[in-house]
Regions:
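Redox cofactor-anchoring modules in respiratory/redox and cofactor-processing assemblies
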Residues: 1-158
């Protein structure tokens, strides 16, 4: 049943959603991914339950007690609304480079070009922030923000 799946051109973290009826695959994508959409799940008080089968990077659920080898079924749901960006250090744990991703994101959002340059905007690509976007409790579209910051720099230089 294609309605219960999200078809992604590319990988789960950096790919884009494809409509099975009218969509197309990206020219440079080397994989196609299908994950459950998650719209068939009905959780009564999902936020208030211990969540033994749910993945959480921040140990918000008790599933971390089951051991590190536990397998999780992840789907495409955001599970909640957008929230304010908080400085929790969760990006630092998964970011592959030695820069301050939270401060860089705040500089990009504020359109502060001098601060973006000082914090290393020239060293990053939106895909570098894919894991940050996955573990983000604020559900911010971090890759889109970084792409906007890089586009702003390009526009300023030309």
């Amino acid at each position: 049943n294609l309605a219960a799946l999200r078809i992604i051109s590319g990988n789960v973290l950096t790919g884009h959603k494809v409509d099975p009826a009218t969509g197309w695959l990206g020219a440079y994508d080397t994989q196609i991914t299908a994950i459950p959409e998650g719209n068939d799940v009905n959780e009564f008080l999902g936020w208030g339950m211990p969540g033994l089968g749910k993945y959480s990077m921040s140990h918000s659920y008790f599933s971390w007690l089951m051991g590190p080898k536990k397998e999780y079924t992840l789907d495409a749901r955001i599970k909640g609304g957008r929230r304010a960006m908080i400085m929790s250090g969760e990006y630092d744990r998964v970011f592959p480079m030695d820069i301050y991703p939270e401060y860089l994101l705040k500089a990009i959002i504020a359109y502060d070009i001098d601060k973006m340059e000082a914090l290393g905007i020239y060293e990053v690509a939106p895909e570098d922030f894919a894991l940050c976007e996955f573990v983000d409790t604020s559900k911010i579209e971090i890759q889109r923000i970084v792409r906007g910051g890089l586009d702003l720099l390009y526009k300023e230089m030309n």
